[in-house]
Amino acid sequence: ADQLARLRAEFQANRYLTEERRQNLARELSLNEAQIKIWFQNKRAKIKKASGVKNTLALY
């Protein structure tokens, strides 16, 4: 629960992480960098999907 709260707080502050920030978060939360990266990717995708934004490039 603390990990999730920390990830959400970080996401609120910045939707995209630098490599250094990702490494620090991984260390702080005892997760690996890939887990942090995927969590952020999924969170961005979820918000994009919920907002109804469509990828117009996919049509061509």
Curated annotation (Swiss-Prot):
Residues 1-41 bind DNA. It comes from the Eukaryota. One of its GO terms (molecular function) is DNA-binding transcription factor activity, RNA polymerase II-specific. The keyword Protein biosynthesis does not apply. Coiled coil: none annotated. Belongs to the engrailed homeobox family. This is Homeobox protein engrailed-like A. It comes from Myxine glutinosa.
